[in-house]
Swiss-Prot record:
Gene name of the encoded protein: MT-CYB
Record-listed heme b b562 binding positions: H83, H182
Location within or outside the cell: Mitochondrion inner membrane
Source organism of this protein record: Ovis aries musimon
Positions that bind heme b b566: H97, H196
This protein's name: Cytochrome b
Amino acid sequence: MINIRKTHPLMKIVNNAFIDLPAPSNISSWWNFGSLLGICLILQILTGLFLAMHYTPDTTTAFSSVTHICRDVNYGWIIRYMHANGASMFFICLFMHVGRGLYYGSYTFLETWNIGVILLFATMATAFMGYVLPWGQMSFWGATVITNLLSAIPYIGTNLVEWIWGGFSVDKATLTRFFAFHFIFPFIIAALAMVHLLFLHETGSNNPTGIPSDTDKIPFHPYYTIKDILGAILLILTLMLLVLFTPDLLGDPDNYTPANPLNTPPHIKPEWYFLFAYAILRSIPNKLGGVLALILSILVLVIMPLLHTSKQRSMMFRPISQCMFWILVADLLTLTWIGGQPVEHPYIIIGQLASIMYFLIILVMMPVASIIENNLLKW
């Protein structure tokens, strides 16, 4: 009798994606982040669903409903903090996943890569809208500042901002629509993630060497299911350490003050995972220029396949490119630090230099390093 998992219409899909999938025999722990992102997404949808049962999207009651969840709902505090810190874990995994793709040349799978960039944008939009929902000071002012950036668009900017706000300022209409979008977006992300996987399974996974591995494949189960379970345990352990010991470590104290349109916080800043982009935005004195730089800082990922000048796919055997990559990582960490600092003397110039370096490394230094390596190998 043929195994049901190979014949049943639904089981067959699961089987071909997670059980009998031929996988390269040498993929490292950097390939764990895809499954970890899936776990993060499921965790966020589940905790978010339970939070939505008790949350009220109204300017007068939003803040107190979050307080109510933490104080009165059974295990509400742990659900709330798992959701808030789960977002941080989600972005840590996302950055690692994208970094892995850049290092090992995974961007040559064009469809998979481009859907991945769309997924990154969708996740960032979802996280931003979620940050507005508790209706604290940083929620309100973050929403005001970031949505206001659209007013830099020539001609239609002001109308566009008022259309998004649903009025002349961030108010009840804004909060309600952000809640609606924040609820629906994770399901769109889940659907896109399936398409992401669909295209990945058309080509098969890349591997650290960047060399085709068709001659040396192993079944996904049990080898990589076990490996993924180890990753999942470490992810959940890290998340629960955050949640149970330092739940507010990555949050902003200002968000424990209810939103007040008459009182601006001294330093308006987004969550830590947006600080690198926020630093790039702030480092340009022109509003439209800043907005364009902000969008391009993420959109530059789309042109990575065009910037690939090396004859090798992976950076595994390319020491100069490796140096460039790690300089880029250091630069992103610098930008993240600057994004959280006030706009004053040493920080402004450091932010501007780091922003220039960011685009310079990606657009000039990495392609040039690849050409130098080609010539050194006489290719």
